[in-house]
Structures are given as structure tokens and as C-alpha cells.
């Protein structure tokens, strides 16, 4: 810090003394450009009439990044050289042997931060007068870094897309040139290019817009490129595929629904058919009234019970169930059984009798009960032409029995009227 202050004091002193001396610093070329990493030479020379015994040279820099903070680069005073700012250590030196009237310096391995305005201040006592400051600009050039290529926007056919290209580094600022890598190396007719911003706008893209595009970033000392593949998407095939898939799915669903409906219908039909086949057609038949007994004959009361007699009305069949068949002849046989009791009741005694005529009870002059019983086999079942079942009557045997009142009273019988019944047991 003390050395820096002494250098600044010497620079001010030399400046004041230079007003009266004849020392003159020659004009510099104004600006020096160098690529990053290379060596830059900053020229500075002066003329004097005095010996170089008291020569003082100071190099200062005003950085481009921070103009308010000047920095010392190198100092020559009293026959010795002193380093300036830390970032210049080992990289800066005088091009010639000091002391000399050529006080140019070099900077090795230049960096981007080395860009700025350099000042050369020369004093050589006792010379006075002239201009003792030289100014030289240094620009460290940086080639463009590898640019980044992007696509902005939809790539569907008919859309607008923007091709972007930019480099992070590059001094001077690079320019960008887009081209399509085909036979013509030209952009589509609908493309608009901005070389400063590095953009290309392609409107209403089509299948012809597809291809490989190249962006070239360049400046004074170098170039760099990037590639971008633009593939325009045609929506028609995708829409056709979606429609085809939807139609196929709908068709499958319809087929499944039809199959389920048909299966349910056939199942219902077969089930209903089985139920119809299981049903036997029934016909309601009317029974005719049983025939009335024309005569009542007394029978012996002690009749064997093994005859299996039943109280029933005569079974008849309606003539409408017969197809032009004559009405069968009923063969009824009456058996008259007389017992000793019959003789005991004969004479003048009047015995009340009860007659069974099928519908009602009639009191007669003899007190005896006449029971009419039918015994016969069931009618034969015969099929008819219309699918119904008819029955063919068999011959029946009718037996009449007479029971005396005394016998009925002895067994505790009560007179009742039995209505006529059909073959099935229902009342007529």
C-alpha cells in the first residue's frame, strides 16, 4: 500500500515537472485487440533531452468492468521494476531493457477481464514541458461459445415456430446465421431471420419445412455452430388412427351387446318352451245328473262288506266330448236280496222307507233305506285328434241295497241327504 502511494506521488510529480520540461510521449495507435489467451503488446514511447538517470514510468488501467477503480499494472522507478495489481503478477513486463525511451509492456495469457483503457505516464527529470501521458485501449476478443439451438412453438402442421440460437460468450458480440442443410442451403420462403438476435420465425409450417437446420455464430476471431432437426407433425394420420380406434371399440361393444341380447332371448325362449311342454292340456268337463231310480226293491240288510260299495251318483259323460260316437249303453243290473228280516216286516205293518234318487231324499210307505251303488272300472283313456284326452266309458254294475229303519236306529244312523258328486269328487 505504501509502494502504491509512492508511485502515485511520483506520477503526480512527474506530471507537474513535465509541464516545464521538453519530454514528449508519442501518440499510441489507440486500440489493441487480441484473442483471449494470447499475448498483447501495449506500445508507449517518449523523447527527452536529458539522461535517463531519473526515469519513472507508471502503467495504469481503468478496467472496462469497473471504471471507478483504476489499477496499477507495472512500475519502473530508480532503476527497478515493481509489480502492480495481483492479477497481473507474472504476466506483465517491459518489452525492452530498462531504462529506455520505449517503455512498451506485454501482457501474457490475456483474459477477458484485461479489457480496458491503459495509460502510460513518463517522467525524466530535469526535462520539462510536452505531453507525458500515453493512452492505449486493450480489447480481449473471445470467440463465440457453442451456441444453444431450440425450437419454440408447436411443430404441428400449419403452426408457427421460432428457431432460437444464442452463445453465452463472444466478444465482440457474435452474429447468427441460420441455414437449412439441403441442396439449396436456403430457409423456407415463409421464414424470417434476425441475425442479431439469432432467431428464425417460420410461419405456417408444412411437410417441406421439415429438415436439419444449422446455426452459425461468428465474430472477428472465431465461429461456432449448432444443429437442430425440425420435424413437422402431420395431425391427419393420428386423427385417423384415433377415429379408427373409436370405431373399432364401438363395433366390438355393439357385437357384445347383440351377443348378450341374443343369448338372453334364446335362453328365455327355450325356458318358455320347456314350460309349455311340461304343461298337460286340461279340459273342464261337465257331469250329467245321475239317473233316478225308477223302483226301489228291498234288499237284505246283511250284505257282505267285501263288495266295497261306495255312495256315489251315476257317472255319466257329456255327449259333447264324443266325436260322432253313439252314447254308450249303460248296463245296470239290480240284485234283489231278501232276508228273513224282509219277511218279518211284510204284512200289514207300514215301514217308512228312504229312497236315494241321486238328488233328494223321498219318504215312502216302507221304512227302509234304498242305497244305490255303482261298481265299475275307470273309463279307458283314448287320444283325440285335437290333442286332448277322451275317456271311453266301461260298463258299470249298479247294485241296490235296502236297509231297515230298525237297523239304522240300532247303529245310531241319522238321516242325511247326500248331494250328487262327480267322478272327481266335486259337487254337481
Swiss-Prot record:
Concerning SUPFAM superfamilies, the annotation shows:
Immunoglobulin
Which molecular function terms from Gene Ontology are attached? ionotropic glutamate receptor binding
The UniProt entry lists membrane topology as: Single-pass type I membrane protein
Q: List the disulfide bonds.
A: 44-120, 165-215
Tell me where it resides. Answer: Cell membrane
- List of residues that carry Omega-N-methylarginine: 375
Q: Which Gene3D superfamilies match?
A: Immunoglobulins
Q: Name one GO biological process term.
A: positive regulation of mini excitatory postsynaptic potential
Which positions fall inside the Ig-like V-type domain?
23-136
One GO CC term on file: postsynaptic density
PTM comment text = N-glycosylated.
Arranged from A to Z, the UniProt key words for this protein are: Cell adhesion, Cell membrane, Disulfide bond, Glycoprotein, Growth regulation, Immunoglobulin domain, Membrane, Methylation, Receptor, Repeat, Signal, Transmembrane, Transmembrane helix
- Topological domains on the Extracellular side lie at 23-239
The signal peptide here is 1-22
> Glycosylation positions?
102
Which parts pass through the membrane?
240-260
> Which stretches of this protein does UniProt put in the Cytoplasmic compartment?
261-428
Q: Which domain of life is it from?
A: Eukaryota
Chain ranges of the Ig-like C2-type domain: 144-234
Q: What does this protein do?
A: Functions as a cell adhesion molecule through homophilic interaction. Stimulates cell growth.
Q: What is this protein called?
A: Immunoglobulin superfamily member 11
> Which gene carries the instructions for this protein?
Igsf11
Amino acid at each position: 500500500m505504501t509502494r502504491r502511494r509512492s508511485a502515485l506521488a511520483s506520477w503526480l510529480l512527474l506530471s507537474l515537472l513535465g509541464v516545464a520540461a521538453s519530454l514528449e510521449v508519442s501518440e499510441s495507435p489507440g486500440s489493441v485487440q487480441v484473442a483471449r489467451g494470447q499475448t498483447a503488446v501495449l506500445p508507449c514511447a517518449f523523447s527527452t533531452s536529458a539522461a535517463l538517470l531519473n526515469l519513472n514510468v507508471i502503467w495504469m488501467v481503468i478496467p472496462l468492468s469497473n471504471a471507478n477503480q483504476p489499477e496499477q499494472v507495472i512500475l519502473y522507478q530508480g532503476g527497478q521494476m515493481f509489480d502492480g495489481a495481483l492479477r497481473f503478477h507474472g504476466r506483465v513486463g517491459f518489452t525492452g531493457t530498462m531504462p529506455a525511451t520505449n517503455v512498451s509492456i506485454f501482457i501474457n495469457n490475456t483474459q477477458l477481464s484485461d479489457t480496458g483503457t491503459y495509460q502510460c505516464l513518463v517522467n525524466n527529470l530535469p526535462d520539462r514541458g510536452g505531453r507525458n501521458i500515453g493512452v492505449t485501449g486493450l480489447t480481449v476478443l473471445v470467440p463465440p461459445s457453442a451456441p444453444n439451438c431450440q425450437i419454440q412453438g408447436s411443430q404441428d402442421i400449419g403452426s408457427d415456430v421460432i428457431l432460437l440460437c444464442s452463445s453465452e460468450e463472444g466478444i465482440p458480440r457474435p452474429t447468427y446465421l441460420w441455414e437449412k442443410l439441403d441442396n439449396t442451403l436456403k430457409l423456407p420462403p415463409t421464414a424470417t431471420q434476425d441475425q442479431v438476435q439469432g432467431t428464425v420465425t417460420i410461419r405456417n409450417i408444412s411437410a417441406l419445412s421439415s429438415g436439419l437446420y444449422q446455426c452459425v455464430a461468428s465474430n472477428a476471431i472465431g465461429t461456432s455452430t449448432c444443429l437442430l432437426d425440425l420435424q413437422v407433425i402431420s395431425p391427419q394420420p393420428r386423427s385417423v388412427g384415433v377415429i379408427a380406434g373409436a370405431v373399432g371399440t364401438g363395433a366390438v361393444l355393439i357385437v357384445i351387446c347383440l351377443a348378450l341380447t341374443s343369448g338372453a332371448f334364446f335362453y328365455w325362449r327355450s325356458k318358455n318352451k320347456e314350460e309349455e311342454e311340461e304343461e298337460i292340456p286340461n279340459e273342464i268337463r261337465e257331469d250329467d245328473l245321475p239317473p233316478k231310480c225308477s223302483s226301489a226293491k228291498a234288499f237284505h240288510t246283511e250284505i257282505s262288506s267285501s263288495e266295497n260299495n261306495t255312495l256315489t251318483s251315476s257317472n255319466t259323460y257329456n255327449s259333447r266330448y264324443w266325436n260322432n260316437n253313439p252314447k254308450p249303453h249303460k248296463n245296470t243290473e239290480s240284485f234283489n236280496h231278501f232276508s228273513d228280516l224282509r219277511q218279518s216286516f211284510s204284512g200289514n205293518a207300514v215301514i217308512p222307507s228312504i229312497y236315494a234318487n241321486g238328488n233328494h231324499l223321498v219318504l215312502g210307505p216302507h221304512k227302509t233305506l234304498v242305497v244305490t251303488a255303482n261298481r265299475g272300472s275307470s273309463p279307458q283313456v283314448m287320444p283325440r285328434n285335437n290333442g286332448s284326452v277322451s275317456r271311453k266309458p266301461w260298463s258299470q254294475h249298479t247294485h241296490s241295497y235296502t236297509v231297515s229303519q230298525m237297523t239304522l236306529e240300532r247303529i245310531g244312523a241319522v238321516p242325511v241327504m247326500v248331494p250328487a258328486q262327480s267322478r272327481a269328487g266335486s259337487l254337481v
